[in-house]
């Protein structure tokens, strides 16, 4: 007895990794995600390593996790992996208060975002 195994969320030749609560807005994270969409994994890692964007560090960690999932959990060839999907969305927002003049205050919103990276094993062309 027990629970039935849930179906996979991606195809058999794909692997998935999700990064939640990445500090920064979804708009800024999407700029970095656009750099790697459709690229080979090795190429995408190099682009992220030399990017000046601060969020590139977090995206690189999520991409490395997706590659590790592909290699260890799904037995896919790491050299043939391509970034199929890099989707970005909003997560929670931290609310803080900033003291202003004349006894007033202003609300400061510190946003968090999430990223979902799917890597796919590309077939060899003969």
UniProtKB/Swiss-Prot annotation:
<keyword id="KW-0689">Ribosomal protein</keyword>
<comment type="function">
    <text>This protein binds specifically to 23S rRNA; its binding is stimulated by other ribosomal proteins, e.g. L4, L17, and L20. It is important during the early stages of 50S assembly. It makes multiple contacts with different domains of the 23S rRNA in the assembled 50S subunit and ribosome.</text>
</comment>
<dbReference type="GO" id="GO:0022625">
    <property type="term" value="C:cytosolic large ribosomal subunit"/>
</dbReference>
<dbReference type="GO" id="GO:0003735">
    <property type="term" value="F:structural constituent of ribosome"/>
</dbReference>
<dbReference type="InterPro" id="IPR047867">
    <property type="entry name" value="Ribosomal_uL22_bac/org-type"/>
</dbReference>
<protein>
    <recommendedName>
        <fullName>Large ribosomal subunit protein uL22</fullName>
    </recommendedName>
</protein>
<keyword id="KW-0687">Ribonucleoprotein</keyword>
<dbReference type="GO" id="GO:0019843">
    <property type="term" value="F:rRNA binding"/>
</dbReference>
<comment type="function">
    <text>The globular domain of the protein is located near the polypeptide exit tunnel on the outside of the subunit, while an extended beta-hairpin is found that lines the wall of the exit tunnel in the center of the 70S ribosome.</text>
</comment>
<dbReference type="InterPro" id="IPR036394">
    <property type="entry name" value="Ribosomal_uL22_sf"/>
</dbReference>
<comment type="similarity">
    <text>Belongs to the universal ribosomal protein uL22 family.</text>
</comment>
<dbReference type="InterPro" id="IPR005727">
    <property type="entry name" value="Ribosomal_uL22_bac/chlpt-type"/>
</dbReference>
<keyword id="KW-0699">rRNA-binding</keyword>
<comment type="subunit">
    <text>Part of the 50S ribosomal subunit.</text>
</comment>
<keyword id="KW-0694">RNA-binding</keyword>
<dbReference type="GO" id="GO:0006412">
    <property type="term" value="P:translation"/>
</dbReference>
<dbReference type="InterPro" id="IPR001063">
    <property type="entry name" value="Ribosomal_uL22"/>
</dbReference>
<dbReference type="Pfam" id="PF00237">
    <property type="entry name" value="Ribosomal_L22"/>
</dbReference>
């Amino acid at each position: 007895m027990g629970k039935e195994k849930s179906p996979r969320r991606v195809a058999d030749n794909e692997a998935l990794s999700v990064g939640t609560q990445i500090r920064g807005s979804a708009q800024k994270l999407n700029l970095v995600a656009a750099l790697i969409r459709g690229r080979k994994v090795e190429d995408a890692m190099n682009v992220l390593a030399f990017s000046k964007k601060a969020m590139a560090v977090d995206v690189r960690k999520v991409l490395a996790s997706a590659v590790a999932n592909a290699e260890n959990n799904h037995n896919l060839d790491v050299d043939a992996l391509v970034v199929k999907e890099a989707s970005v969305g909003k997560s929670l927002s931290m609310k803080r208060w900033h003291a202003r003049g004349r006894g007033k205050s202003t609300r400061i919103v510190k946003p968090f975002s999430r990223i979902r990276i799917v890597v796919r094993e590309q077939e060899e062309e003969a």
